Amino acid sequence: MRLTVPGNLLLLGEYAVTEEGGLGLALAVDRRVAAELEASSSLVVEGRWGERTVHWNRESGEASPLITAIVETWREQLYSQESTKAREAGEPAGRIIVDSSAFFEGGRKSGFGSSAAVTVALTCALLHLSGFSGSRLLHCAARLALLAHRRAQGGRGSGYDVYASLYGGFGCLVGGAEPSWQAVELPWLPPLYIFRGPASVSTPNSLHSYERWKGSNPREWRSFFEESNQGVRRFLQADSWPQARRAFTASKELGLRLGELIGVSARIEAHDSLVPGLHKALGAGNELGIYLAEDPPDEPALEPVVVAPEGVRWQS
């Protein structure tokens, strides 16, 4: 049995989506994590992260904090409290190989949300071992993968990346302790391209800077939060790209201002041939940029973004 899970990007709603009621527009990217299930006398997981391979079992849980968080969440939720039937059946055994090599380029992560995609893939594989299938598996995976990913991130995480990888396509996430995901259609959206920023950016450090600024400036934060949500709503309510373009540009400018306030720049240099108002930084910082191309770009540094309409994909 084999399954694949797409990557993800957050197009709009940086930082605000981590808040209760914060909106974020996300999408699934057709660069996939693969998971294969094989027979085994015990539960073992092999993780292939680019050029690095980790081996996880009960005795070597420290080999991968992410795998440990996923397995422990599955174990606690299903075999500690899910049902008497599950506890009596005992934990199933199997060998699971999770490969995220497609998310690495020259030893550097691509920025397509590999940790969330790995979390979804391994969670679905574990649930399959537990006898789940179809909509029941998908529903349970949404809950467990979110818990596991937050656990691996120290309790944080909006969930946009988990849900985008799980469901595929475009979606609007409403952030909070129990986030919600609503699929959206954007038929007028121009082709998307990404390009690299100057260096990797630590998302936890960026969020720490944001939280520190928020605590010291509650009134300014409230203004930012409301403006961010308004920008996402206007983008989603647009009937055409010219309407949505204004909301996109406003969201970009808001991100630039916030970056200056919290000390984490959202300013990203792009090639002179790109229209300035059509590109912005993605995520917390300027590690990755996105360009919405009204005309075919002639710039080799740009990488086309292929949207994955399908989330988890199973293969026999």
Predicted regions and their residues:
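Short secondary-structure junction motifs
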Residues: E91-A93, G157
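DPxDG-like acidic metal-binding loop motif
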Residues: S110-G134
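Short, low-complexity, charge-dense intrinsically disordered segments
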Residues: Q81-E88
